[in-house]
């Protein structure tokens, strides 16, 4: 898959030595991150302050952004070096093993590396950093009133994959092929083909999952304006692949009229 981090939507954390674990504002997610870090790396007690501008529950990687930010702050304080792959794995373990949240590596790999990343998963998987300047104009939009728990979406897919459901397995393979086509289009600077891969990816998702009509409405509005569209994650936010900046401005206005928060890239 392809993913890009957004500077305008990010999480920050600050860590300092303390007698006992302290987190401000209180957060089970942050506490679990500090505890896991301390256990894995035998680190002393720490106090952590954190903040985020990432909307939660709309498929923009809000929880994983917080975990990665806290891990970075802890690494800086305790002078620990974690490569991006290890940081992503640790972040995933915190959510899945410690908190019982259904999740995958995707968001965590993208956030641990930063920038534009192409990801291959499974046997022989690899992560490739690409130049963000290859991207065409994009618009990211989300509906705060249509948030949902991403774990619920992931849990359904994970259950079917474990059961080796033929339709689900075939769909995931198709998504992987579409992602490779998107990478090729990006490198060739074929933005029209890139937009089509966004549409193709969404169409596969729609076959595999029962989607919230409020989220689908965003995709359909973008497509009606001639841009490619896909979910950014589990649902609630979309990314529009636009022809140029003027086209992006038109798409952003239309999505704002639906009550969306928008961010143009």
Q: What residue spans do the PLM features occupy?
A:
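C-terminal nucleotide
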Residues: 3-42, 51, 74-80, 89-102, ...
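Glycine/charged-rich beta-loop-alpha catalytic/anionic-binding loops adjacent to active sites
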Residues: 44-56
